[in-house]
Every structure is written in structure tokens, then in C-alpha cells.
A protein has these predicted regions:
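N-terminal accessory segments that target, anchor, or regulate ATP-driven/P-loop NTPase machines
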Residues: 1-52, 113
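Conserved ASCE/P-loop NTPase catalytic core
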Residues: 34-381
Length: 381
């Protein structure tokens, strides 16, 4: 197979597939990923770990206190980060079960150059491996990735769906977006006129994966997260019409997926308010007089320690502190793992074939790690 055939085959495999609502419900009976939440799908993409019994190796036994450590092939290039990755997977497992973590922001905290951004990029790349199912009407896909199950009422329809299609009660309850509600009225309540599209999350096309960054404090507003009215559409629609709204916010695009907030605590506090209701209640308000928008995904944030300390010490931010799940991403403190990091960096540069004296990388690693070590307080050593 040449490169052109290989590319075409990959493109064809990633094309959207369309189903009727009845066909989608039949798929749910056979494939639980069709109704799984974002954390469950990310766990499927990460896969099973290789378990390492550190008691069998003297060096590792002292570092990990004889624990059995999980090493995930999906993160094999992240050296010396076993604890951080295990905490992320623990967060995802609990969020997948519908526990309190589902309502919290996953926050990577660590020093500059510790690997937070690389971890975030890998999580977003993994999110692309499992498809999502999105409502469609009149050939137009939902702009906020409405899941087909949002059409059903948890009080009225849950028992029938569980009995006929094996869909657990807890997967119902996500609200319908204003876009879907308008189409439902147009169809006269006939939900069979909706179609369901199987799409693959994409970083490139911002499908179920979005990224936002703090802007200038004077001109950044919440529209970066929740979207705003598209003035080009006001010629044809009223200002409070769902079709006049531009669903361009990061929360709109990241529904059913993952939203990355870079340097979150550098953003003005007013910009962060939609995150509270999006995580706690699964919905948030837009900037105009339309009904609430749904959010059923993961919010991933990261910043350096100095911003976190400043934010934590401000008493006005207590509401956020309770809704943050902190994963510490410290510097690597193992020489063997630090050498692997240098080798990885060299392999991705032109210096891979440059001559290097024996022991150079080991000396650099020792020096770097010694510069990171601090004398512990209350130590007898």
C-alpha cells in the first residue's frame, strides 16, 4: 500500500456515519461506548496498564515503598510521571462512575517545564480515538454536540430505555440545547425525524475538543467560553432565536469531549464563572436570552504554582477551590528517567547524529536533579 492509498483509507475510516434514532438505540444495546460519558471514553482510549511489582527491584522498591505501580502504554514516553498519570486515571475512573469527580475540574499543577502541557496534549489526542454520537436535523449537525439521549425524559422514559436497550438510568438527564428544542417543536414532537451522526472527535476541527487561553483582562469576556450572538444572522432571526446564536465558545465545542484551559488562573475571575455551573449542574447560560446550554465533558486546566498560590490565597475564590481536582506534576527526580527524557528530545532534533562523549547525558541528569532537590524540613538525615 502506497502513501496515497494509506491516506485515503484513513480518511474514509474517519468519515461521519448517519443513523436513524431507532438504529442508534439498537447500537446502544450492543456497544456501551455509544452512550458512555467523556471520562469513560477516555479510559477506553488509555487502555489497560502493565503492572510493575516494585518489590522485585531494590531501587524501585525504595522509591515506591514496594507498591505495585501501573504503567500505561498510552503514556510510555512520559518518564518519571507514574504517580501523576495514576492520579489522572483515578480521576477518570471516579468521573466515569458518576461520582463527585465528574463535577470537578481536572487541574494539573506543577513547575515550569514539568510536562503539564504535554500531558494535556496527550489526553486530547487520546480523546480522538473513540467516536461520539451527535443529534442531527435537516442535514445539520448539532452545534453543541447534543447527545441523542437528551431527547428523553429521565422520569418518564428511563425504565423503558433500560428494559428495551439496557441503557442505565444515570445516563439520562443531560438537558436539550436550545437548537435541539427548536427542532423538536418544528417536528411537532416527532423525535423519529431526528438523525444521529457518528463523528470522531478532532483537535483540528474542534469537534468535542476545544482549547482556550487567557486574554487581555480589559477585553476578554465569557463569550470565549459560552459563545455569543452572530450578528450576520440577525437579518433573518430574532436576537433570542437559537439559530441567531454563534455556538463558538469553548464549552459549546467541547460538549461530550474535553476542554483545555491554559493558564486558567491568569484569566479574570468573571470569565471563570460559567465553569462552576458547567461542572456542577451540567449546563450554563449563554450571553443572550436563550435557554441553558448543555455540558457533559471534562474540563482540563493547568498553570504554574505561582498563579495557583495567588488564586488560593484570595478568599473570594473559595467556590472554585472546592471544585478543583489537583494533580501535581513535579520535576523528574530519577536519573535513569531524566536520561530517557534527554534522549527523547535529542531523537526529535538534528542533534540525534551529533557526537556525544560517554557519560554526558548522565552527568547532565545528575546535575539537573541535584538542582531540584531540597533539604526536607524536620528530617533527621
Amino acid at each position: 500500500m502506497n502513501i496515497f492509498d494509506h491516506y485515503r483509507q484513513r480518511y474514509e475510516a474517519a468519515k461521519d456515519e448517519e443513523f436513524t434514532l431507532q438504529e442508534f438505540l439498537t447500537i446502544c444495546r450492543q456497544d456501551r461506548s455509544a452512550y458512555a460519558n467523556a471520562a469513560e471514553r477516555l479510559l477506553m482510549a488509555i487502555g489497560e496498564p502493565n503492572m510493575v511489582d516494585t518489590a522485585l527491584e531494590p531501587r524501585l522498591s525504595r522509591l515506591f515503598s514496594n507498591r505495585v505501580v501501573a504503567r500505561y502504554p498510552a503514556f510510555e514516553e512520559f518518564y518519571g510521571m507514574e504517580d501523576a498519570i495514576e492520579q489522572i486515571v483515578s480521576y477518570l475512573k471516579h468521573a466515569a462512575q458518576g461520582l463527585e469527580e465528574k463535577k470537578q475540574i481536572l487541574y494539573l499543577l506543577g513547575p515550569v517545564g514539568g510536562g503539564k502541557s504535554s500531558l494535556a496534549e496527550r489526553l486530547k489526542a487520546l480523546m480522538q480515538r473513540v467516536p461520539i454520537y451527535v443529534l442531527s436535523a435537516n442535514g445539520e449537525r448539532s452545534p453543541v454536540n447534543d447527545h441523542p439521549l437528551c431527547l428523553f425524559n429521565p422520569q418518564e422514559d428511563a425504565q423503558i430505555l433500560e428494559k428495551e436497550f439496557g441503557i442505565p438510568h444515570r445516563y439520562l438527564g443531560t438537558i436539550m440545547s436550545p437548537w435541539a428544542a427548536k427542532r423538536l417543536h418544528e417536528f411537532g414532537g416527532d423525535i423519529t425525524k431526528f438523525r444521529v451522526v457518528k463523528v470522531w472527535p478532532s483537535i483540528l476541527e474542534q469537534i468535542a475538543i476545544a482549547k482556550t487561553e487567557p486574554g487581555d483582562e480589559n477585553n476578554q469576556d465569557i463569550s470565549a467560553l459560552v459563545g455569543k450572538v452572530d450578528i450576520r444572522k440577525l437579518e433573518h432571526h430574532a436576537q433570542n432565536d437559537p439559530d441567531a446564536y454563534g455556538y463558538s465558545g469553548a464549552l459549546c465545542r467541547a460538549n461530550q469531549g474535553i476542554m483545555e484551559f491554559v493558564e486558567m488562573f491568569k484569566a479574570p475571575i468573571k470569565v471563570l464563572h460559567p465553569l462552576l455551573t458547567a461542572t456542577q449542574e451540567g449546563n450554563y447560560n449563554g450571553t443572550e436570552g436563550i435557554s441553558a446550554l448543555p455540558f457533559n465533558g471534562i474540563i482540563l486546566a493547568h498553570s504554574n504554582e505561582s498563579e495557583w498560590v495567588t488564586f488560593r490565597n484570595n478568599k473570594n475564590n473559595e467556590a472554585f477551590l472546592d471544585r478543583v481536582y489537583i494533580v501535581k506534576v513535579p520535576y523528574c527526580l530519577r536519573i535513569s528517567e531524566e536520561i530517557k527524557i534527554y534522549e527523547k528530545l535529542l531523537n526529535h532534533s538534528e542533534l540525534v547524529h551529533a557526537p556525544c562523549a560517554p557519560g554526558t547525558l548522565e552527568t547532565l541528569s545528575r546535575f539537573s536533579i541535584l538542582s531540584r532537590l531540597k533539604e526536607p524540613e524536620n528530617s533527621s538525615i
